[in-house]
Design a protein with these regions (language model features):
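Glycan-recognition and processing domains
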Residues: 10, 18-113, 121-132, 171-187
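N-terminal Sec-pathway targeting helices
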Residues: 1-18
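Extracellular Ig-like/FN3 beta-sandwich strand-entry sites
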Residues: 113-115, 163-165
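Short, surface-exposed beta-strand/strand-loop-strand elements in extracellular ectodomains
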Residues: 128-143
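Short, aromatic- and glycine-rich surface loops/edge beta-strands on solvent-exposed regions
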Residues: 164-172
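Extracellular carbohydrate recognition and processing domains
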Residues: 139-162
């Protein structure tokens, strides 16, 4: 009788361990993490760690695309930490240069709006090797316009829903440019 009880307990313990092991594998494959964590650590879409909740965006907030400290070591505020792949990763004191054909920036707006504009300040723009082609700007794979020179450019995005991930993609086949600041503004 004691052998049967010992066997039954052993089978129960083994079953519990198997179930626990399967749960651990499931949690490893499908973690419940924030979108910032997923995009930075799991899919590697973000180049800078924005912190939890920092992809959220309030319209009209102008962010500069530089390092967190200037050349003298002074802290800077409103630094764009939502940049994805395709951007320079260090020594970004005068803005951030593109390093690939496609460069990404991500937003999660806090509120919905019918008329939103993307405002970009390009400080350097070189099209010598691009056959004169402009920078094409896409939001969620929809072309919203072109940037054809340095300076401030305002492009209409249109309707934006709250808590929806906006993927801004700058496509430049061979153009080199430096993005100094960026914002989403209401009309």
């Amino acid at each position: 009788m004691k052998k049967n009880i010992a066997r039954i307990l052993l089978y129960i313990i083994c079953a519990v361990l198997v179930v626990f092991y399967i749960m651990v594998l499931w949690w490893g494959k499908n973690p419940k993490v924030g979108i910032e964590y997923r995009m930075y650590y799991l899919t590697h879409e973000l180049t800078d760690w924005p912190g939890y909740g920092n992809l959220k965006y309030k319209y009209g907030t102008k962010e500069i695309c530089t390092e967190y400290k200037d050349r003298n070591g002074n802290e800077l505020h409103n630094v764009c930490s939502r940049k994805g792949q395709g951007w320079q990763k260090s020594k970004r004191y005068e803005g951030t240069k593109n390093t690939a054909k496609d460069s990404y920036i991500y937003y999660i707006p806090e509120e919905s709006s019918d008329e939103i504009y993307l405002v970009c300040d390009i400080t350097e723009y070189n099209t010598e090797s691009s056959d004169g082609k402009d920078i094409e700007v896409y939001v969620n794979d929809k072309l919203i316009g072109n940037i054809d020179n340095k300076g401030v450019t305002k492009l209409k995005i249109g309707n934006v829903s709250a808590d929806e991930l906006l993927t801004v993609r700058f496509h430049a086949d061979y153009a080199e440019y430096t993005l100094y600041s960026i914002s989403l503004d209401k009309a």
